């Protein structure tokens, strides 16, 4: 095997077509050349194996990855190729008897048909792809050369075969040797390369890293759906490339050639997947679906966003849920310090919200007995001009509870009847 490097100057087309790839368990190779194209002028031949593309090893690339790698080389394409040595045929000795009548080498018509059929079995260089594979390459738009029309292919393939009549000799004729062994360039790679099975084992995988732009963070309580952008494949009406059918745009009902978007189970041309209200193309970012219509985030917020209970305007950003309604964050604030309450605790006093520190400062009450705050829901009583927890209003000497009982007071401290005249 001879390895060599070829550099093609851009722009595309480069004048060749690839076949194989890791996903086909077949090494990448040149399957067809454009006559007079850039690849043909650089000495590339049909059957050459592709070792690297622009310096990257091609052994771990799938068919689509290799094509994308070639597309990325805009003005300069560097390929490392490998070519098998052609087999040298041995010269055959031909006897030329004189003055003998000529007769065909094949004695009867049945052997003649057998030879013709056998000729058809020979592998033809450059046609290793199946018809379905070529159709897939045509649908996906991943070809690197312009195909000649079918009539030209048929004319170029119909090369007349002529057999030189072999004169009969007195010596016995040698038996027909059978079809010629194909050259190494047309033999399958698993028969030529002993390391093929190990290199393309099924358990070996390749990883593709792609950059993806995340849509904006969705508004709380809303459901955003992101766009799934697919490479060109197959799919009828949005099925994609899994069922092998050509995708049809849901908007214009035309067959899609090239890139397309899949959203809500339907396929679209990228330029026809637009907002129903403003007409903005939604190829990048998120979108909303409401009653069968598609909206961009700004239009959806304006049309379907909730209203603020204070200013009555649409809430297009962060939503504050409080008191069984919705608010702008800057509209639901403390009545004292005017700071947004957000997710903090708050208290209502005379219909206005207060944050916890301001409420305690303005309306908070402390127990005279324990000096702790009397929270909402706590049982308390008013006595001696102060507020008391019901469990804290006790005799200052014997600690008996005085709630609902007669008591005496000395130095603002409650005393029971037994200790009314005791020293405090």
Swiss-Prot record:
Biased composition (Pro residues): 174-187
GO biological process, one term: actin cytoskeleton organization
Residues the record lists as Phosphoserine modifications: 78
Compositionally biased region (Polar residues): 81-98, 204-221
Residue ranges of domain LIM zinc-binding in the record: 247-305, 306-365, 366-424
SMART domains membership: LIM, PDZ
InterPro entries, sorted: PDZ, PDZ-LIM_domain, PDZ_sf, Znf_LIM
CDD domains: LIM1_Enigma, LIM3_Enigma, PDZ_PDLIM-like
GO molecular function, one term: metal ion binding
Key word Phosphoprotein present: yes
Primary location: cytoplasm
Chain positions found as Phosphothreonine: 96
Gene Ontology, cellular component aspect: adherens junction; filamentous actin; stress fiber; Z disc
Subcellular location: Cytoplasm; Cytoplasm, Cytoskeleton
Biased composition regions of type Basic and acidic residues, renumbered to the chain: 110-123
Region (Disordered): 81-221
Pfam families per UniProt: LIM (PF00412), PDZ (PF00595)
Lineage top rank: taxon: Eukaryota
Alphabetized UniProt keyword annotations: Cytoplasm, Cytoskeleton, Developmental protein, Differentiation, LIM domain, Metal-binding, Osteogenesis, Phosphoprotein, Repeat, Zinc
Domain PDZ: 1-85
Entry remark concerning the domains of this protein: The LIM zinc-binding 2 (LIM 2) interacts with TBX4.
Role of this protein: May function as a scaffold on which the coordinated assembly of proteins can occur. May play a role as an adapter that, via its PDZ domain, localizes LIM-binding proteins to actin filaments of both skeletal muscle and nonmuscle tissues. Involved in both of the two fundamental mechanisms of bone formation, direct bone formation (e.g. embryonic flat bones mandible and cranium), and endochondral bone formation (e.g. embryonic long bone development). Plays a role during fracture repair. Involved in BMP6 signaling pathway.
Complexes and interactors: Binds via its LIM zinc-binding 3 domain (LIM 3) domain to endocytic codes of INSR, but not with those of IGF1R, LDLR, TFRC, or EGFR. Interacts with various PKC isoforms through the LIM zinc-binding domains. Binds to RET in a phosphorylation-independent manner via its LIM zinc-binding 2 domain (LIM 2). Probably part of a complex with SHC and the RET dimer. Interacts with TPM2, TBX4 and TBX5.
Protein known as: PDZ and LIM domain protein 7
Record organism: Bos taurus (Bovine)
This protein's encoding gene: PDLIM7
């Amino acid at each position: 095997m001879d390895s060599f490097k070829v550099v093609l100057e851009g722009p595309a087309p480069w004048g060749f077509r690839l076949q194989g790839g890791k996903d086909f368990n077949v090494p990448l190779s040149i399957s067809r050349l454009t006559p007079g194209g850039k690849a043909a002028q650089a000495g590339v031949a049909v059957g050459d194996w592709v070792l690297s593309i622009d310096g990257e090893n091609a052994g771990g690339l799938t068919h689509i990855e290799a094509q994308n790698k070639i597309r990325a080389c805009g003005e300069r394409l560097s390929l490392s190729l490998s070519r098998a040595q052609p087999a040298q045929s041995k010269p055959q000795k031909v006897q030329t008897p004189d003055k003998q009548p000529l007769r065909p080498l094949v004695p009867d018509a049945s052997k003649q048909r057998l030879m013709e059929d056998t000729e058809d079995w020979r592998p033809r260089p450059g046609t290793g792809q199946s018809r379905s594979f070529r159709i897939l390459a045509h649908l996906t738009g991943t070809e690197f050369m312009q195909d000649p029309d079918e009539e030209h292919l048929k004319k170029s393939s119909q090369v007349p075969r002529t057999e030189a009549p072999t004169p009969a000799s007195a010596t016995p004729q040698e038996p027909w040797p059978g079809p010629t062994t194909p050259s190494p360039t047309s033999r399958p790679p698993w028969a030529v390369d002993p390391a093929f099975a190990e290199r393309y084992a099924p358990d070996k995988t390749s990883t593709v890293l792609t950059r993806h732009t995340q849509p904006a963070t969705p508004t709380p309580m809303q459901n955003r759906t992101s766009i799934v952008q697919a490479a060109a494949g197959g799919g009828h009406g949005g099925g994609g490339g899994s069922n092998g059918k050509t995708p049809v745009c849901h908007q214009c009902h035309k067959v899609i050639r090239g890139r397309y978007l899949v959203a809500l189970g339907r396929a679209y041309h990228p330029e026809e997947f637009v907002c129903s209200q403003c007409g903005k193309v939604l190829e990048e970012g998120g979108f909303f679906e409401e009653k069968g219509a598609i909206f961009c985030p700004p239009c959806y917020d304006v049309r379907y966003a909730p209203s603020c209970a204070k200013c009555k305007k649409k809430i297009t950003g962060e939503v504050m849920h409080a008191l069984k309604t919705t608010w702008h964050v800057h509209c639901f604030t403390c009545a004292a310090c005017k700071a947004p309450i957000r997710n903090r605790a708050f208290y209502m006093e005379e219909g206005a919200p207060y944050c916890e520190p301001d409420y305690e400062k303005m309306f908070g009450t402390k127990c005279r007995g324990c000096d702790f705050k009397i929270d909402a829901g706590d049982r308390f009583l008013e006595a001696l001009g102060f507020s008391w927890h019901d469990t804290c209003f006790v005799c200052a000497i014997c600690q008996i509870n005085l709630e609902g009982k007669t008591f005496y007071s000395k130095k603002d401290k409650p005393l029971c009847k037994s200790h009314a005249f005791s020293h405090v």
